[in-house]
Swiss-Prot record:
Source organism of the structure: Photorhabdus laumondii subsp. laumondii (strain DSM 15139 / CIP 105565 / TT01)
Gene expressing this chain: queA
Pathway linked to the protein: tRNA modification; tRNA-queuosine biosynthesis
GO terms (BP aspect): queuosine biosynthetic process; tRNA wobble guanine modification
Family: Belongs to the QueA family.
Entry keywords, A to Z: Cytoplasm, Queuosine biosynthesis, S-adenosyl-L-methionine, Transferase
PANTHER family to which the protein is assigned, alphabetical: S-ADENOSYLMETHIONINE:TRNA RIBOSYLTRANSFERASE-ISOMERASE
The protein's assembly and partners: Monomer.
Stated name of the protein: S-adenosylmethionine:tRNA ribosyltransferase-isomerase
Alphabetized NCBIfam families for the sequence: PRK00147.1, queA
EC number: 2.4.99.17
Any one GO CC term of the record: cytoplasm
Length: 355
């Protein structure tokens, strides 16, 4: 299967650089995976698409202000993007500089270069950095870090992004990108869903910068997926099994919830799903057989990305590419701050032939 099979033309003006004034006020394109039928609406229509007893699975990760600017003590400017917090003093990070810092290099970080740090070691493309400060890593990032807006949002981060690029239910700091499908849920919508009898549980997957990396191979089977840490606790497992037993739908809010649930199912030997606390490198593309997720709420994704491949595996390749063509024609807003889709799984997608 070729990466180029997943391309589509997207005018620049359809990339959303700011969210809608009201979280739940975005447009919603609904796709019935089994029939391919498309319907247009607004995000609050999800209330009508869910029944009492259905289970919404959210990702409660919280985005950290992971981008720091500074320089080497010797003078060269650099940009640090924290990928993973190792402990109270150390992080793994991407470093962009004219010349990569060597082991032992002293760094001066922050807009006023007030924070001293040391480059301890290099691990492939990531740098292990120690913050030489009495504060813990998360406090430091909160003080001097910038929100790590995706590369396709062509503007500097603003103070408002600290709230807007965060789900209202986020509580586990560690992500460097938001689980963007969840950005559309506000408290009134969540309360209306609860009143209807829709159940809610939370997984945690700390989204890494790898989610924005292009697929650099021609054949998708050759792609090596980046690793992200995920947690699927016992209460989620119990809720999923109970939902399936009563014949209701498990609805994943975002591709990160999909990857968490399906990772837990894949790692399980005897049951449908079991608790999971580990890194996952699950790569979902057409031919993948979903075990857990019945419906998916997701934003529109980049051409040739692993995420549009995941959606194609869920809804069917032809259905997905047709839906994206329709979204472009109808001028939907794309990517992190854009509009959303509600997709019912296509049970035949794993058998679909892609020419």
């Amino acid at each position: 299967m070729r990466v180029s099979d997943f391309t589509f033309e997207l005018p620049d003006e359809m990339i959303a650089h700011y969210p809608q004034p009201q979280r739940s006020g975005c447009r919603l394109l609904s796709l019935d995976g089994e029939t391919g039928a498309l319907t247009h609406g607004i995000f609050t229509d999800v209330l009508d698409k869910l029944n009492a007893g259905d289970l919404l699975v959210f990702n409660n990760t919280r985005v950290i202000p992971a981008r720091i600017f500074g320089r080497k003590a010797t003078g060269g400017k650099l940009e640090v993007l924290v990928e993973r917090v190792l402990d109270d003093k150390r992080v793994l990070a991407h470093v962009r500089a004219s010349k990569a810092p060597k082991e032992g290099t002293e760094l001066l970080l922050g807009d006023n270069e007030s924070l001293k740090a040391t480059m301890l070691a290099r691990h492939d493309t990531l740098f292990e950095i120690r913050f030489d400060d009495e504060r813990d890593v998360l406090s430091i990032l909160d003080d001097i870090g910038h929100m790590p807006l995706p590369p396709y949002i062509n503007r500097p981060d603003e103070e408002a992004d600290r709230e807007l690029y965060q789900t209202v239910y986020s509580e586990r700091p560690g992500a460097v990108a938001a689980p963007t499908a969840g950005l559309h849920f506000d408290e009134p919508l969540l309360e209306a869903l609860r009143k209807k009898g829709v159940e809610m549980v939370f997984v945690t997957l700390h989204v890494g910068a790898g989610t924005f990396q292009p697929v650099r191979v021609e054949t998708i089977e050759d792609h090596i997926m980046h690793a992200e840490y995920a947690e699927v606790p016992q209460d989620v497992v119990d809720a999923v099994l109970a939902c399936k037993a009563r014949g209701n739908k498990v609805v994943a809010v975002g591709t990160t919830s999909v990857r968490s649930l399906e990772s837990a199912a894949k790692a399980c030997q005897d049951e449908l799903i079991a608790p999971f606390f580990n890194d996952t490198q699950i790569f979902i593309y057409p031919g993948f057989e979903y075990q857990v997720v019945d419906a998916l709420i997701t934003n529109f994704h980049l051409p040739e990305s692993t995420l549009i491949m995941l959606v194609s595996a869920f809804a069917g390749y032809k259905n997905t590419m047709n839906a994206y063509q329709e979204a472009v024609a109808e001028k939907y807003r794309f990517f992190s701050y854009g509009d959303a889709m509600f997709i019912r799984r296509n049970p035949f997608a794993c058998k679909e032939k892609i020419s």
